[in-house]
């Protein structure tokens, strides 16, 4: 069928037929994949021991990172000092402020989204 020779009514009928076929194929695909898309489950509330474990894990991340930053600052402050008295004098009067964020490479959600983007990019090519 050449679309140039069809009337508007015939084109509308053809469009309707194709849309119905498309929706039928979508339903068929959904059934073969396991039904309509489901909402992700809501996160459940943590019990107190589970909450403490999650907080302890974050505390370990922060404390290891902060101790590394503190060691670097101490090395900078005491790089030129050679006697124990000089080091004690400088560190006694020092004011430390450590600013940092958790390492984004440790965030599994971001890793997952990057992997999804890579696979999507691979499928497009």
UniProtKB/Swiss-Prot annotation:
Pfam families found in the cross-reference section = Herpes_BLRF2 (PF05812)
Q: Which SUPFAM superfamilies match?
A: BLRF2-like (SSF160459)
| UniProt keyword Coiled coil present | yes
Spans of biased composition, class Basic and acidic residues? Answer: 39-50, 96-112
Region annotation (Disordered) maps to 22-50, 96-125
> Compositional bias (Basic residues) at which positions?
113-125
Keywords recorded for this protein, A-Z: Coiled coil
**Disulfide connectivity?**
none
- Write out the coiled-coil annotation as residue ranges: 5-33
Task: Family membership, please give it.
Answer: Belongs to the herpesviridae BLRF2 family.
**Stated name of the protein:** Uncharacterized gene 52 protein
